Amino acid sequence: MPKRTDIKKILIIGSGPIVIGQAAEFDYSGTQACKALKQEGYEVILVNSNPATIMTDPEMADKTYIEPLTADILEEIIKKERPDALLPTLGGQTGLNLAVELYENGVLERYGVELIGANYEAIKKGEDRELFKETMESIGLKVPESAVVRSVEEGLKAVEKIGFPVILRPAFTLGGTGSSVAYNVEEFKEKLKVALETSPIHEVLLDKSLIGWKEIEFEVVRDKADNVIIVCAIENFDPMGVHTGDSITVAPTQTLTDKEYQMLRDAAIAVIRAIGVDTGGSNIQFALSPESGDFYVIEMNPRVSRSSALASKATGFPIAKVAAKLAVGYTLDELKNDITKFTPASFEPSIDYVVVKIPRFDFAKFPEADRTLTTMMKSVGEVMAIGRTFKEALLKAVRSLELDRYGLAFPKLTNVDKVELERNLINPNDQRLWYIAEAFRRGYSVDEVYELTKIDRWFLYNIEEIVKFEEVLRKEELTPEILRQAKEMGYSDWEIAKIKGITEEEVRKLRKEEGIVPTFKGVDTCAGEFVAYTPYYYSSYERPYYTVDGQEILDED
């Protein structure tokens, strides 16, 4: 289908001030959308209350309003500008909530403004917990045993049936705002009061706790012709119970069997169709039992989300740009891939590398804050790293956090007693990665750490191997082969030097003398299957050749 010609002017709602759970990711998405729509010849009107963004730069939109993001202000702007359409799916939760309010107040109908990207029914089904539950059950997918309550009295009746622990999720909120886990009645009463106040419609979903299950996310895009693609599947390092924004995440998924992956992929496609998002992207989250393989649908964001920015950068597929073009009538097969200039956007990205995201916390600025990670997001940012292996990407990401830590060593933890160590493994906080490494240094087995953390054993084995290699570096002579192994694993020159008690310059000199230098690999959305005109690159110490019958064959990638 060609682009729509019946709409000329499009209003985009920005995400407003930077808050926990809604930060630069939405500026990144909104900027992409403004550029894409202007490229197609549409007049773009942008409303955002935050002038410190790229999207509010003068050249991004035809007209930019720096105004408070309220329904009354938006009505005045709509009255003045008379846009043909409103695109609310790029402004995070703020954009969605305002679109719903404008629709329900009759403002959109009064001024003849059409919702594009996601219609009112799709937004309600995705965001209203009760409607979402009914929709999932209608297509045969399970959601955790739950109840929607609007008062403390209703909550007390419902929790008798659901039992403890119970997760509280306020409707129409972002970043897990107001959500929590309650383990007894007294705690439940206090947390439910907070959750009810947090929800703009005073509605809270009480969920059966699935703490300890794996959390898997799918970034899905659908068009008007019902073409659906999975842009990326993202696995959470931390099990259920930690907000996905505070969890270390990995793409592609590392621990799923093919059967589990295909099962969740089919479910994700069924969810986006049932909710009715037909011109854009959605983020769909699942809980998967590590024992039985059973799964539940946790939630769905019928909009470009925080994870969409991560998936875009991880794969090279510009989700926000594509979503904006789908909203004005294009189909996936009509849009060309920017990197290959040949394949259509309906061609699912292939990932032949590993991407790791680690959240960045800043508890030093909030000394009174509880560092325990729960269902309410606390991180203030995140870093992303790309490597050929999980170990390499993880260590790259750790160095990018700017915490003056170059690996999994954290000397302060050597004096922590066993009780405190295990308490911090059971109750995850922002230091959990280093506590896990410390446990392995003290001789804990993978199974013992798994019982305390419920983090999948595959991830734990990888961390254990990184820690064990510290001992190899410490005790063995730094031969070219050991140095190469360390670099392939992701160790930095600085960290190797510190372990060996030599200078970073000495390590670098030895490395270069032995020809141990980085090779650069491309992110091209297709794993090298097609010519890439505008790929981006990541460095790796993977050997740039393969051995065939004892002969070294150069890798031409």
UniProtKB/Swiss-Prot annotation:
The lineage of its organism: Bacteria, Pseudomonadati, Aquificota, Aquificia, Aquificales. Its EC number is 6.3.4.16, 6.3.5.5. It catalyses: hydrogencarbonate + L-glutamine + 2 ATP + H2O = carbamoyl phosphate + L-glutamate + 2 ADP + phosphate + 2 H(+); hydrogencarbonate + NH4(+) + 2 ATP = carbamoyl phosphate + 2 ADP + phosphate + 2 H(+). PROSITE patterns: ATP_GRASP, CPSASE_1, CPSASE_2. Composed of two chains; the small (or glutamine) chain promotes the hydrolysis of glutamine to ammonia, which is used by the large (or ammonia) chain to synthesize carbamoyl phosphate. Tetramer of heterodimers (alpha,beta)4. The gene is carB1. Belongs to the CarB family. Large subunit of the glutamine-dependent carbamoyl phosphate synthetase (CPSase). CPSase catalyzes the formation of carbamoyl phosphate from the ammonia moiety of glutamine, carbonate, and phosphate donated by ATP, constituting the first step of 2 biosynthetic pathways, one leading to arginine and/or urea and the other to pyrimidine nucleotides. SMART domains: CPSase_L_D3. This is Carbamoyl phosphate synthase large chain, N-terminal section. Coiled coil: none annotated. Its cofactor is Mg(2+); Mn(2+). One of its GO terms (biological process) is 'de novo' UMP biosynthetic process. InterPro entries: ATP-grasp (IPR011761), CarbamoylP_synth_lsu_oligo (IPR005480), CarbamoylP_synth_lsu_oligo_sf (IPR036897), CbamoylP_synth_lsu-like_ATP-bd (IPR005479), CbamoylP_synth_lsu_CPSase_dom (IPR005483), PreATP-grasp_dom_sf (IPR016185). Pathway: Amino-acid biosynthesis; L-arginine biosynthesis; carbamoyl phosphate from bicarbonate: step 1/1; Pyrimidine metabolism; UMP biosynthesis via de novo pathway; (S)-dihydroorotate from bicarbonate: step 1/3. Mn(2+) 1 binds at Q285, E299. Residues 133-328 form the ATP-grasp domain.
